[in-house]
Each structure stands twice: as structure tokens, then as C-alpha cells.
């Protein structure tokens, strides 16, 4: 979809760059890239293309949205970010949380995802139940990412590769463990591990395994496992689209 990005002031652009520097330092110091990426994704992934509600508009800071089961643990991210936000009040929460996701990927060795400022904060959080369920298969992934958010099959597989960062926590999701050997390094190892089968100590969710059994998803898994550069290019595009759902639509 064509975008018509708002023009922001020089002062606002300066605030964005200051926030970027502060985020780099925080994420490097606290090794919290996976948590910040999850915050950005869960903030944006509530967008519903038919009703034009939800999306990356700063509502994750509300107790109502933080209480959604899929967001368990994200209150930690919100609390970690608040001192920077208080220091840089000019930037919207909407931009700030998406910028945190962009910086998380960059600091971890991933691609430089473009960032366009100008999202405005919205007061009302989306209803619960719009984020993907890790226990379900490819039909569910297409319903949530495709029909609800308006993303493509390629976007679904590329974004799944973001699980190269982080781990599941039993108390948050019911699952336990990392997807890869180095959960703080953004690379294509999610795909290589997925293709190599179950391994002790590494996690493969039902939604991960669904990528292998689907005739459209599996060739993309194989492509990204063989070609990290191709994965980075497609991930960059998919992350950008996710971070701008409902924002600056022409």
C-alpha cells in the first residue's frame, strides 16, 4: 500500500535520534533486544484492516492492553523504557515503541529496518484476541497476518524468522526455551534449526512447524535457511510493513 508519511518538525526528528541513541545503549546494556522486539510486534500486530482499529499507536502502555494474556511480561519492557520516554517527552509512545523494535534488530546484528516517524498516540486499546496463537497452524497464521493485518505469505515466514531472537517463558506462554543456540544474535538460524528437526534444549512451536508442512511457506523457509542475505532483505520489508500498519496510508 502506498504511504503518505507526515512531515515532522526538526525538533521532533532530533527527539527521534536522541531516543535511538538511548535505546541502543539500553538494549546493549540490558541484553533486552528480544523483549523490545516483542513489544513492538505485539503493539503493531493488533491492527485490523477491515475496521482500521488497533495497530502501532502507543496503547501498549495501558493496563488494559498489558493485561491481555498474549502480552504477559511486556510490562517489564514498558517499565524499562519509561525513563527514556520521560527524558524525551516530545516523541510519541507510538513512535517510541516501534523505534525500540527497529533498534533491537539492528543492535543484535540484523538488518537496518527503515523508520518513518509521525505516529500519533491513540487512547483506546484494541480488544483482546488479535495476536497469533502459537499452538495453531498455517490457516490461523494466514487468518491473523493475512486477513486481519493484510500481510503476505512471504511476510509471515520472514517475520517468523524474528524468533531467532529470544526464548519462550513457561509462566508467560506455557512454552519454555529458545529457538536458536544464540538467542541474542539476529541471523537466519531460526530457519536452519527448523529444517534440522527437534533438538534437546531448543524450541519448535506448533506455529513454527506449520511453516514446514505448508506448500507455500516451506520453500521460503528453505530459501532463508540457505541465504541469510535474502532473509534480511525480506525481513526488513516485512518488519517495516508491520510497524506501519494503519499509519500514513495514502
Curated annotation (Swiss-Prot):
Q: What is its main location?
A: cytoplasm
Active-site residues annotated for this sequence: 42
GO terms (molecular function) for this protein are: heme binding; L-ascorbate peroxidase activity; metal ion binding
Q: Which positions does UniProt annotate for heme b binding?
A: 163
Enzyme category, top tier: oxidoreductase
SUPFAM superfamilies, alphabetized: Heme-dependent peroxidases (SSF48113)
Cofactor binding note of this UniProt entry: Binds 1 heme b (iron(II)-protoporphyrin IX) group.
Give me the ranges of the annotated region Disordered. 113-137
Cofactor(s) needed, names only, are: heme b
Stimuli inducing this protein: By salt stress and hydrogen peroxide.
Gene3D superfamilies, alphabetically? 1.10.520.10, Peroxidase, domain 2 (1.10.420.10)
List the EC numbers from the record: 1.11.1.11
Q: Does the keyword Cytoplasm apply?
A: yes
A Pfam cross-reference name:
peroxidase
Name the UniProt key words of this record, in alphabetical order: Calcium, Cytoplasm, Heme, Hydrogen peroxide, Iron, Metal-binding, Oxidoreductase, Peroxidase, Potassium, Stress response
Tell me the protein family, please: Belongs to the peroxidase family. Ascorbate peroxidase subfamily.
Record's function text: Plays a key role in hydrogen peroxide removal.
In the UniProt entry for this protein, what further remark is given in the free-text comments?
Binds one cation per subunit; probably K(+), but might also be Ca(2+).
Task: Identify this protein by name.
Answer: L-ascorbate peroxidase 1, cytosolic
Q: Which organism is it from?
A: Oryza sativa subsp. indica
Amino acid at each position: 500500500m502506498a504511504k503518505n508519511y507526515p512531515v515532522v518538525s526538526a525538533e521532533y526528528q532530533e527527539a527521534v535520534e536522541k531516543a535511538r541513541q538511548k535505546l541502543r545503549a539500553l538494549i546493549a546494556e540490558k541484553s533486552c533486544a528480544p523483549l523490545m522486539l516483542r513489544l513492538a510486534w505485539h503493539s503493531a500486530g493488533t491492527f485490523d484492516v477491515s475496521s482500521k482499529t488497533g495497530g502501532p499507536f502507543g496503547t501498549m502502555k495501558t493496563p488494559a492492553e498489558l493485561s491481555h494474556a498474549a502480552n504477559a511480561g511486556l510490562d517489564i519492557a514498558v517499565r524499562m523504557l519509561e525513563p527514556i520516554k520521560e527524558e524525551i517527552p516530545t516523541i510519541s509512545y507510538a513512535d517510541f515503541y516501534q523505534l525500540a523494535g527497529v533498534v533491537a534488530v539492528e543492535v543484535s546484528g540484523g538488518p537496518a529496518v527503515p523508520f518513518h516517524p509521525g505516529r500519533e498516540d491513540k487512547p483506546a486499546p484494541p480488544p483482546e484476541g488479535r495476536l497469533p496463537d502459537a499452538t495453531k497452524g498455517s490457516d490461523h497464521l494466514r487468518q491473523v497476518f493475512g486477513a486481519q493485518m493484510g500481510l503476505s505469505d512471504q511476510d509471515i515466514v520472514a517475520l517468523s524468522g524474528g524468533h531467532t531472537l529470544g526464548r519462550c517463558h513457561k509462566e508467560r506462554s506455557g512454552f519454555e526455551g529458545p529457538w536458536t543456540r544464540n538467542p541474542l544474535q539476529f541471523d537466519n538460524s531460526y530457519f536452519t534449526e527448523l529444517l534440522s528437526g527437534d533438538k534437546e534444549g531448543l524450541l519448535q512451536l506448533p506455529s513454527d512447524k506449520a511453516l514446514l508442512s505448508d506448500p507455500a511457506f516451506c520453500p521460503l523457509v528453505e530459501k532463508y535457511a540457505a541465504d541469510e542475505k535474502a532473509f534480511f532483505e525480506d525481513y526488513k520489508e516485512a518488519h517495516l510493513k508491520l510497524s506501519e500498519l494503519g499509519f500514513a496510508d495514502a
